[in-house]
């Protein structure tokens, strides 16, 4: 619905942009401002996309003789329209997809890409493939003709249409990943924006003779006819999806999870929750959820058949019922017996099995929270990959080691630093030394150590990561007196640009490279508890699961991939009250201390305030024992008000500037 409303408003916005751009009518700025505000509160991601599309259109429309004043005023007006809605905008940008890590955001972006062979194939709609993205061969042909034949000042929309078409292809994804605001670059959704500016340029093509105008209209209409057969879009819910939704609804006490990578369609998101049904972990627009990262990792675990992680984290999310689409079992060589064994480790029992789906039920209270003890914590940008491979580790909430207290980190057996950051290297090194002295095993992934601000070298605790490039596979490793071989690098990473270790006194692992023995693993000269690992070996193991690499990584970390965190289910109750909720934990086992952190299995929201201590742990709301009263408070209200004031002031300045320029022009 929000996208439909935006599609309705977009032509009017483009009209006002055209009026000011071509005729410099000041009243058009009011239209741009109001429509930008309306679209902002309708769909924040779409206004970001429209802003990007408008910027590109105005960039292509720029002509030296005309200057850039009008283009700048239009863009500034749109920015002010967004800022004026700051009271709503600032809270909406907190959490969800805006805070999604780059890897997860990249996976979402991939879902909104399409090969040219599909996006320019009109037969897909005729053959019944209604789910395929179709850009429009007619739009492409007319855009090419417009670029070649239209007036230079009136072809910007044609250029934009072709540029957006190219940007919808998977080949461009590596570039888009590195762009600012990449979370908003769901490229196939830019199509409606491309259409809007395309039709603007088509209307402006004044030299187009009447026969060619008629021919253009005919081409567009003929291309659109298959899309007008609306009955083919009235598709009944997938029978398997309906059946699974009913199965989950009838067997769930607290929350259900369907692991199907959305292959069963959108119905389960609706069907599980209807008729007095159950809560649901996913939901069709899960990308905007506070638990978007958690959900993305569950999907990734299913794709990689990492069932230990999938089912353990399902407990963390409060799923007492988990259904797995059977077509994904075996994709990486696992069997249903392997899945059942992983389920048993997390307390699940296989209760239903068909050729379509298998259903697992958690043994425990109907409504429960979770107390968890992890073996270790991974701090840094690449934490998620490590936790997928070693589920007994948790991913830290921050990549900056200085955001943690030493006492907090001392509660873990192992701390892994991979892609981490710090404010001052000296303080970070002191923290690591202190942890090691207290008996904590600290593993430093030297491949992703921050570069020194002065020397630009990747150095930490006197150990340096030196660049090296390997082809196809690692050399044979010499580790702990044993020769260890590994399989090749992933096909898309055949050239492995990484680094070896120098400066370490106690080398534990070496490899031969150009007649030299170079180090890839070592321990600190002052503490056996500090371990260095290079060659991006941790990442390699996380993506390949190679048995040779597993031997080394398992020894360095001191844990097995099969290990799981220790979880205890606690009976819990929650009740929504007027303007808040009450969470009660009265029946905690005797071995659970009063100071225990209890994951309520409810997503943490920034609207929660309480006189009791509440915490955000891995995007979940955590409380203590007893009764916790939580009130709902409008989040980030005053920062939002400040942003709105900035927007009003900015628009006032733009209006004054536009009036002055108009007066000068009139004189």
Language model features by range: what are they?
Residues 1-247, 308, 319-324, 331, ...:
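Membrane-embedded transmembrane-helix bundle of lipid-linked glycan/lipid transferases
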Residues 27, 207-210, 214, 316, ...:
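Ser/Thr- (and often Asn-) enriched beta-sheet segments in non-cytosolic proteins
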Residues 64-65, 126, 331-333, 524-526, ...:
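Intrinsically disordered, low-complexity coil segments
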Residues 96-101, 260-267, 571-574:
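A glycine-rich phosphate-binding loop feature that marks nucleotide/adenosyl-phosphate handling sites
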Residues 218-526, 534-548:
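Extracytoplasmic
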Residues 358-360, 518, 529, 581, ...:
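Short beta-strand micro-motifs in enzyme catalytic cores
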Residues 380-382, 562-667:
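Active-site-proximal, structured, solvent-exposed surfaces of multi-pass membrane proteins
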Residues 546-561:
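Short amphipathic C-terminal alpha-helix that caps PH/PH-like domains
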């Amino acid at each position: 619905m929000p996208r439909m409303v935006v599609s309705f408003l977009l032509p009017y916005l483009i009209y006002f942009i055209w009026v000011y751009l071509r005729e410099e009518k000041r009243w058009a700025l009011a239209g741009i401002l109001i429509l930008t505000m309306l679209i902002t509160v309708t769909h924040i991601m779409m206004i970001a996309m429209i802003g990007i599309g408008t910027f590109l259109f105005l960039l292509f429309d720029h002509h030296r003789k005309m200057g850039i004043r009008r283009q700048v005023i239009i863009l500034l007006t749109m920015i002010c329209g967004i800022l004026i809605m700051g009271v709503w905008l600032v809270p909406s940008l907190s959490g969800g997809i805006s805070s999604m890590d780059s890897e997860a955001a990249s996976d979402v972006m991939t879902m909104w890409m399409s090969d040219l062979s599909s996006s320019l194939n009109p037969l897909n709609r005729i053959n019944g493939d209604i789910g395929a993205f179709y850009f429009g061969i007619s739009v492409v042909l007319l855009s090419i003709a417009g670029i070649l034949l239209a007036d230079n000042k009136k072809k910007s929309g044609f250029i934009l249409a072709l540029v957006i078409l190219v940007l919808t292809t998977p080949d461009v994804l590596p570039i888009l990943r590195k762009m600012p605001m990449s979370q908003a670059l769901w490229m196939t959704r830019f199509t409606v924006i491309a259409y809007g500016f395309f039709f603007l340029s088509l209307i402006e093509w004044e030299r187009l003779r009447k026969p060619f105008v008629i021919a253009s209209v005919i081409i567009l209409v003929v291309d659109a006819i298959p899309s007008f057969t609306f009955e083919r879009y009235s598709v009944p819910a997938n029978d398997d999806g309906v059946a699974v939704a009913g199965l989950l609804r009838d067997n769930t006490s607290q929350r259900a999870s369907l692991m199907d990578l959305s292959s069963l369609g959108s119905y389960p998101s609706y069907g599980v929750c209807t008729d007095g049904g159950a809560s649901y972990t996913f939901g069709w627009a899960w990308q905007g959820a506070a638990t978007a990262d958690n959900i993305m990792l569950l999907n990734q675990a299913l794709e990689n058949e990492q069932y230990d992680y999938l089912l353990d984290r399902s407990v963390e999310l409060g799923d007492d019922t988990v259904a797995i689409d059977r077509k994904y079992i075996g994709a990486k060589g696992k069997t249903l017996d392997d899945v059942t064994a992983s389920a048993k480790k997390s307390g699940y029992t296989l209760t239903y099995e068909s050729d379509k789906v298998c259903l697992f039920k958690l043994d425990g209270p109907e409504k429960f929270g979770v107390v968890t003890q992890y073996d270790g914590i991974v701090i840094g940008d690449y934490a998620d990959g490590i936790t997928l491979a070693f589920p007994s580790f948790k991913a830290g909430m921050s990549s900056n080691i200085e955001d943690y207290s030493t006492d907090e980190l001392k509660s873990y057996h192992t701390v892994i630093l991979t892609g981490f950051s710090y404010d001052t290297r000296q303080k970070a090194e002191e923290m690591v030394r202190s942890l090691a002295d207290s008996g904590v095993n600290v593993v430093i992934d030297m491949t992703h150590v921050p570069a020194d601000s002065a020397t630009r070298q990747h150095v930490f605790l006197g150990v340096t990561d030196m660049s090296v490039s390997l082809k196809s596979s690692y050399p044979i490793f010499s580790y702990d007196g044993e020769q260890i071989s590994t399989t090749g690098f992933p096909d898309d990473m055949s050239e492995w640009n990484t680094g070896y270790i120098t400066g370490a006194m106690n080398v534990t692992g070496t490899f031969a490279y150009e007649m030299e023995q170079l180090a890839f693993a070592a321990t600190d000269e002052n503490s056996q508890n500090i371990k260095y690992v290079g060659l991006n070996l941790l990442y390699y193991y996380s993506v390949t699961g190679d048995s040779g690499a597993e031997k080394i990584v398992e020894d360095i970390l001191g844990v097995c991939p099969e290990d799981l965190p220790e979880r205890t289910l606690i009976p819990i109750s929650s009740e929504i009250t007027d303007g808040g909720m009450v969470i009660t934990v009265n029946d905690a086992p005797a071995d659970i201390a009063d100071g225990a952190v209890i994951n309520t299995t409810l997503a943490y929201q920034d609207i929660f305030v309480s006189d009791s201590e509440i915490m955000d742990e891995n995007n979940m709301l955590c409380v203590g024992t007893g009764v916790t009263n939580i009130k709902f408070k409008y989040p980030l209200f005053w920062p939002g008000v400040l942003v709105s004031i900035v927007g009003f002031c900015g628009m006032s300045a733009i209006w004054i500037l536009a009036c002055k320029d108009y007066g000068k022009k009139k004189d």
